[in-house]
């Protein structure tokens, strides 16, 4: 047994990074005097005891998942660089999830916005498919050894029951609710929705091969239990059934699941799982909907108190535990993989504020190390098969350096949090 007094951060020597994993969040309170700068008022030493002779087993590689609101950033200068760095963590084993993959537009990104113009209609109302921008995004992933975690959404303008207004102009100073525009509504024609998804999935199979695409994840929408979905729960389940049936029509061995709910989903999640396991499928008329994985989101809740940020790790772990317990309550899902499809210190990567000041420094990295070390323990205790925890952070192209967004890099400069994933790898 060894004992060491330390005030080191994750950016210190490699051994200290290991201490963060073993000791968790206790390093957050350490001072900064080792850097030659004064320790914060009220700082205190932290003693960490490590038994190097005892092995607790391997840490499951749940960290291999990342994502962002803005899919088009992946094909831009700094985005390509960062995708390459993610792929290098563990080639062919890292996955990327993005919102807005089916949104209508010219492909120019903005905060919390992206588009591919994959679906339009001609003057006769006939579908026109264009995979050019989508191919560019997925080609970038594959060239760097990253695979898609395909989020089927959002609604193309030509299919939305309420297409106007469509593209939002959200800024961090605006109300979050301003993002919910025409893309968030149900389709005016579920058959056309299904055919769009089928044609997209078939195109992916033809372009990348069935053996490759069956290793991807496919799920419908994002957080349909909050206003990201402007329809009813029943309409979402219908949307999901038609999408899953379409993917499986293109590739019967495709890995499909969901629903990537906000939080554990509570009763909304239970209703979804009941439908998938025992309900009548809206698309096929048969019993149930294929469910190869179950996904939900878990977020922390940082606050700004007395001049410093107080991280809310308990909120994230509590939400994860709630989600695990919901899945565990279904015996049929005992061995079904679970993915926390967004697993972060808080809920808005593009938002700014004093409570989010942790993002540029080592508090973000320490928090991530502590959280990802504990999630497998919770999953094991609750009796579920945790396969992944997805970090919803990427980069923001053409923004000021260290602008306060939740990201892994800023204009090509890696942030400390990226070193956590290098350590995990």
Where does each model-flagged region fall?
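Active-site clefts of carbohydrate-active enzymes
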Residues: 299-308, 327-365, 394-408
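Non-catalytic accessory regions flanking glycosidase/transglycosidase catalytic cores in CAZymes
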Residues: 12, 24-217, 233-264, 285, ...
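Aromatic- and acid-rich polysaccharide-binding/catalytic face
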Residues: 150, 197, 214-222, 254, ...
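N-terminal secretory signal peptides that target proteins for export/translocation
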Residues: 1-8
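Alpha-helix capping and helix-loop boundary segments enriched in small/acidic/polar residues
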Residues: 188, 231-235, 307-314, 359-366, ...
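Extracellular glycoside hydrolase catalytic/binding regions
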Residues: 273-277, 352-373, 406-423
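Extracytoplasmic, non-cytosolic globular domains
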Residues: 236-247, 316-328, 344-347, 356-380
